[in-house]
């Protein structure tokens, strides 16, 4: 009988600890599920806001970046080459990434297809864009953008694209001489 008593004394605290740990895990899982449920409307709002902004851009609108990006956006273009890098603030992003490219286009980039997913504070957009360069040659590219959202705007963005066609437009076509340093067209 003494052996059983020792077994119970060892097993009982072990079982109690496991039950407490299991309860804590279930409690954390329930809290996480409740958090997800409470943020579900915001996740859907972010997804719809980005989708609607893309639709307006596709239809000819030109306010996508000012509409969707926080003034303090941190935008990273992944990859290697002269166009890859991190831009801090919408003014930096506009001056160093948007303006040099857009100034070399006859027709602006327009999304021609898109897919959007949202999870938590992130919205992921996979899209294809087309434009015409000033020399009449077409520009086509596929993009994947990952936005981290706050207050209905992107505060961080990570962009994946084929930089070769982008850099080719910048290398092939000179920037117009009438574009002042602050003009972002």
Regions found by a protein language model. Give the residues of each.
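Gram-negative bacterial Sec-dependent N-terminal signal peptides
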Residues: 13-23
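A solvent-exposed, acidic/Ser-Thr-rich amphipathic alpha-helical stretch
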Residues: 66-118
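Short, solvent-exposed coil/turn segments at beta-strand boundaries
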Residues: 68-72, 118-121, 147-154
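Hydrophobic/aromatic beta-strand elements that line small-molecule binding cavities or substrate pockets
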Residues: 111-116, 128-131, 142-147, 158
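Short beta-strand edge/turn micro-motifs at domain boundaries
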Residues: 145-168
